[in-house]
Amino acid sequence: ELRDVPGMPKIDLMSYNQLLRKKSLPRATYVFTDFDRIDFWTRELAAKAYRCLTANNARALNDPASARTRLPMLKKLQGEGLNSFSVWDAEMDGLPDRYPVFLRTRAAHRGTQTELLTTPEEARSALDELVRSGLCLSDLMFVEYCAEPIEDGLFRKLAAYCVGDEVITGMSVHDENWHAKYGKEGVASEAHYLDEMQAVKENRHAAGIAGHFKAAGISFGRADFTLVKGKVEVYEINTNPNNSLILDHPFPLRVETDALFHQPLAEAMRAIDTETGGDPILMDHPDLVSQRKRDGYLTRPRWTP
């Protein structure tokens, strides 16, 4: 977790259930996350809370009202020429008109749900099978294949973190499979890890990916991306990224690289930190007040209009 990283400021966690029951909040920096995992009304109320904070000059990152989730974000990135690959809403857009593609869910972080599909017939069959299995049509999307091996049979997925105004090149993963979701131990060489270290030292990808965060309306998160013909191609931006320290590795230089990466990350987190003290901030938006009155005595909220 970020809280385990040396030099990090104090980080407290708060669920949306806890947030929306608060009559006031202490002055602090607030980071809103996980919009693909909450329902529409919780997100709308969170946006009202965000506005209570910013109206009182509190620092808040990731506006719930405007931050884009996976499908609209990827459509936006392609529309602005920042990404070159297409995506299709399986419910609204019909079958893709470019191949190969794969299916995945719009929400959560479950990775690909199919291998590559090369024809409309394969796409239709795969979509029908996933729906029969219980996945919701409204949560499925087609994604055009966009990957390029860095050498024969080896794929690399890159990462960059946005913290306020700072973008920081992160650690990479290597895999023999184009998914490259978690990486596979033993497939990368020392030369690959030396290149990773150099990328972290020079913050190689910050300039090339800053515009993607801005277009997505995200000021805190991790972009997972690759390079295809030298061009950045962003797969997703996770507003609540998993982060773990590398304490042991067959190549010790990876441990060193991980420490080098976490130094500027901690510095960026300290830069957005807020000093404690001052008057609390009232969560006095009428919708928040009304919701608290309705649900104040329930153990579980019924977050509905």
Q: Which residue stretches match the model-derived regions?
A:
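Short, surface-exposed charged micro-motifs
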Residues: 159, 222-224
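Short, solvent-exposed loop/turn elements at beta->coil junctions and helix N-caps
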Residues: 90-92, 145-149, 224-226
